[in-house]
């Protein structure tokens, strides 16, 4: 895959521990390296979001999540594969394979394989990313780059410009173990 210069620049910022904003399927997101504790805590502070709530991890391809999915039953893997890539976020048992600053106080972690081309490109360059809506707690999610800049001014390390994916609502969230819908689309 030949990556765009802007995606390469954003990926470098992420690899260096930065927090970026980027367009997702329905709203603008904030992202960083999930294994970089300082970056994740900075992102949480920008949003005024408690670490206990946990965060979503987004990937370009299901194989980027193999470290997390490798011991799951085949029926669960088939369920995931049948809904990805796409606007389906699943709560998956993390088995302590991700740090607590990503999972919060939960035994599962929210994961999604995106179908947004720019987010896929970014994840191919960086590996899985944190993906959370670009808004301070209690405010509506940003649907424009201007709103991102109004919310966060110069507190971000980068903004990857591009178009939203055209969906009206954030992704559906379901529990992989129970099948329960946690957040409707």
UniProtKB/Swiss-Prot annotation:
InterPro entries: DHBP_synth_RibB-like_a/b_dom, Sua5-like_dom, TC-AMP_synthase, TC-AMP_synthase_SUA5. Its EC number is 2.7.7.87. GO terms for cellular component: cytoplasm. The keyword Cell membrane does not apply. One of its GO terms (molecular function) is ATP binding. It catalyses: L-threonine + hydrogencarbonate + ATP = L-threonylcarbamoyladenylate + diphosphate + H2O. Keywords: ATP-binding, Cytoplasm, Nucleotide-binding, Nucleotidyltransferase, Transferase, tRNA processing. Residues 4-185 form the YrdC-like domain. Belongs to the SUA5 family. TsaC subfamily. Required for the formation of a threonylcarbamoyl group on adenosine at position 37 (t(6)A37) in tRNAs that read codons beginning with adenine. Catalyzes the conversion of L-threonine, HCO(3)(-)/CO(2) and ATP to give threonylcarbamoyl-AMP (TC-AMP) as the acyladenylate intermediate, with the release of diphosphate. This is Threonylcarbamoyl-AMP synthase. The gene is tsaC.
